[in-house]
Amino acid sequence: MKRKLLVAVPLLCVVVVLAWFFRPKHEYLGEAYVSERSTTLWSSVAQVREPIDVLHYGDRVDVIARRNDTVKVRTGSGAVGWVDARLLLEPALWQRSIKILNAAKAMPVQARGRTKVQTNLRVEPGRTEPRLYQFSRGVPVEVVARGVADWVQVSDERENNEAQETKKEDWFLVRGLATRPPGEVSARSSESNTTTPPGDQTIPIAGWVVARFVELDLPEAVREGMASANVRATAWFELNRVATPSGDKPQSLVAGTRSAEGQPCDFTVLRVYTWNQRRTRYETAFIENNLCGQMPIRLDKGPKGEPEFRFRQISGAKEERVYRLTQTVVRRVREPGEANKKTARASAAKSAKP
């Protein structure tokens, strides 16, 4: 018996070593992150295949093989299967998305809205820039900046054989939420107050989207006023609320433009809508035209708590402008030095007259 054990034990060790040496090996090609809300992990690339698992946005995977447009990956739970390589982000792009998010978090919100259609989120303005995510229709987003990019209409988007034409289009830097089924955990998580469907787990995300694919959530009276004035809104804010017998009424500031997309100015028009207590309706309390304003517009408070807003004027006399709402009257607030310069210019012009 002892002799048999002396033979069996070394033989078993040899078998174990050989099995380990000749085990199937997976080459490690790097890591990647899922860029879709959800995608299926398949057993093979054949037409007849089985689903192994479901991956979600932000999941980290190890890439162990490549075949055309598909990659073989290993998940954090150890599952191995195939996914579309176009649905994964390289580590450098993932880190870039984190930097964009951190920068967007520090920016003041310029407007709130929802996606009109399925909308690609990109790292920079431009339809050829790398894609980070795709929002579904009706997803809430917060606008924090505006940009401009060239847009070339390809031939299948035109009804004739005209030469391809390069246009400029507006883009918004937005922050929103990538939603995940309940119970899922991702590589990036944080708090956010954007409304999402009950039960969904969410992680914040930021990037650039085509501006006209976002519908701003303007109050109805403001929307009607902007439409009748033929002004396209690019930013809007609630300045304050006034008490009425039927409840508090918000008073709003809206920035917009009448120009086509792709202009250097973020907005050229400012309008303030206030509530008229006597007539029980909204009215346009303030209009400023012929601006060339730059986002962000920042809200503040005056010495008595009055709403103030400020922005940079980037044409003509490049300066910061400040306005204050007192009850239903909006006036520009000038710094003492600025007021003296204006008085001096007026006096010089008056003395120059014959």
Report residues per predicted region:
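Hydrophilic extracytoplasmic domains
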Residues: 286-354
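Short beta-strand elements that form the blades of beta-propeller/WD-repeat-like
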Residues: 249-263, 304-316
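Boundary regions of SH3-family modules and the immediately adjacent low-complexity/disordered segments
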Residues: 2-5, 17-36, 50, 60-62, ...
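Sec-dependent N-terminal signal peptides
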Residues: 6-13
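Core beta-strand residues in small-molecule sensory/regulatory alpha/beta domains
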Residues: 40-44, 112, 116, 121-124, ...
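SH3/SH3-like (including bacterial SH3b) beta-barrel domains
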Residues: 43-66, 123-147, 152
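Short, solvent-exposed coil/turn segments at beta-strand boundaries
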Residues: 57, 245-251, 277-279, 300-308, ...
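Primarily extracytoplasmic ectodomains and periplasmic/lumenal surface modules that are beta-strand-rich
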Residues: 67-71, 79-80, 150
